[in-house]
Amino acid sequence: MPPGGGGPMKDCEYSQISTHSSSPMESPHKKKKIAARRKWEVFPGRNKFFCNGRIMMARQTGVFYLTLILILVTSGLFFAFDCRYLAEKITPAIPVVGGILFFFVMGTLLRTSFSDPGVLPRATPDEAADLERQIDIANGTSSGGYRPPPRTKEVVINGQTVKLKYCFTCKIFRPPRASHCSLCDNCVEQFDHHCPWVGNCVGKRNYRFFYMFILSLSFLTVFIFAFVITHVIHRSQQKGFLDALKDSPASVLEAVICFFSVWSIIGLSGFHTYLISSNQTTNEDIKGSWSNKRGKENYNPYSYGNIFTNCCVALCGPISPSLIDRRGYVQPDTPQPAAPSNGITMYGATQSQSDMCDQDQCIQSTKFVLQAAATPLLQSEPSLTSEELHMPGKPGLGTPCASLTLGQPTPPSSMPNLATEATLSDIMPLKDEHGGHQFLTPDEAPSPPRMLGAGSPLAHSRTMHMLGLASQDSLHEDSVRGLVKLSSV
């Protein structure tokens, strides 16, 4: 293209009206920037979250801090007043072993307290409504104060029938071995118990860490208690018992704390060792779900029949992922901005379609084919004879793309006046069906009002549509017949 011819085209392209810009007919939607909220901020349970949702604990954490204080104070006194003397007089391995036990105890305690125990997500309102509907259909509608039977399901696990209870708070059927914690207000998978000493529920995802914590804590307590007594006895042999107590008063406090706590810790460790070896939970053992007192037919369907296998599954099996997305973002319901309705886009689309014949594009819509076939007839109508009007196969119609000239035609003198004779009953739409195609008049194309010039093709077609067509029935019939033949070819 020559350089001179590219200028007007570029000016035309740059002067196009943007359909996305605001206009007086539109009210632009002003979006307010709202800070995205994490899902832990709207979590329905009674839990506390720290570090942006990474740490999850129960709401009652007072006893947990007491546990931390007891462990830190006892271990700190031991390392400060006893380990130095024991390392010099007996062996330097004592503080090393004590340090390893201390860090292992603290690590397992924090992992138990800060992790998700296996909380089950609650049902959404749609899921809850659908589940309630299914339950009502299964139980039947209640009337006259009649309460339907308990909402339970029965499943068979290793030949044993297990009931699944419906949780009215979470609106779900709890899976096997799950239970609802009244303190945390959550359904926990493979629920064992709620432990205030660790400040969290004990369930499927943190049970192994809880067991390692109480087991290592029992070893640490016995270790500290034993070497505190050794320290006092060793000093009493040199200076006497009272002088030994005066030289190391912290040893007395350590011995008292360890003496009163070691029995409960060792007992708890032994009890959970039994539960792990039989693949049971504290909740199942308290309820006696698989007790032999109910008969030989009542056996534990979750046990592998081997103590070693049960321990390996509980302590070395894979940890299931968390089912709640604590750190995900809450999706806000943002309104979608409405599409512009000022007619500019529709007009631009109509104008681009009207230029198809000028670009020698033979793929056209039916309204442009009709316009190409009808316009030459109306322009040459004064020179046609009565015989030529009744010739449906006359080749004077021409082809749409080759002979279509959208000029301003002169209406024939035989046309009636619009102001006096045209009525709505005189308007006959040019519609016909042939081969599954429907041919529409040019005026049926959507176009915005008050935006077409007097000399445009669409304005011309609208003017010709308003002419009185009652006296030109034969002319329109010939136009339709010719158009049908063109489309069939």
Curated annotation (Swiss-Prot):
Cytoplasmic topological domain residue ranges: 1-60, 111-208, 277-489
Membrane topology (UniProt): Multi-pass membrane protein
Stored InterPro entries: Palmitoyltrfase_DHHC, PFA4/ZDH16/20/ERF2-like
Region (Disordered): 434-454
MF (Gene Ontology): protein-cysteine S-palmitoyltransferase activity
Catalytic reaction annotation: L-cysteinyl-[protein] + hexadecanoyl-CoA = S-hexadecanoyl-L-cysteinyl-[protein] + CoA
Domain DHHC: 165-215
GO CC, any one term: Golgi membrane
Subcellular location: Endoplasmic reticulum membrane; Golgi apparatus membrane
Class of the enzyme per the UniProt entry, highest EC level: transferase
Stretches that traverse the bilayer: 61-81, 90-110, 209-229, 256-276
Keyword GTP-binding in record: no
Gene Ontology biological process terms in this record: peptidyl-L-cysteine S-palmitoylation
UniProt modified residues of type Phosphoserine: 456
UniProt superkingdom: Eukaryota
UniProt entry keywords in alphabetical sequence: Acyltransferase, Endoplasmic reticulum, Golgi apparatus, Lipoprotein, Membrane, Palmitate, Phosphoprotein, Transferase, Transmembrane, Transmembrane helix
Residue positions of the active site: 195 (s-palmitoyl cysteine intermediate)
EC number: 2.3.1.225
Intervals, Lumenal compartment: 82-89, 230-255
Domain notes: The DHHC domain is required for palmitoyltransferase activity.
Chain's role: Palmitoyltransferase that could catalyze the addition of palmitate onto various protein substrates. May have a palmitoyltransferase activity toward the beta-2 adrenergic receptor/ADRB2 and thereby regulate G protein-coupled receptor signaling. May play a role in cell differentiation and apoptosis.
PANTHER family cross-referenced by the UniProt entry: PALMITOYLTRANSFERASE ZDHHC14, ZINC FINGER DHHC DOMAIN CONTAINING PROTEIN
Family: Belongs to the DHHC palmitoyltransferase family. ERF2/ZDHHC9 subfamily.
Protein name as annotated: Palmitoyltransferase ZDHHC14
Protein species of origin: Mus musculus (Mouse)
Lineage: Eukaryota, Metazoa, Chordata, Craniata, Vertebrata
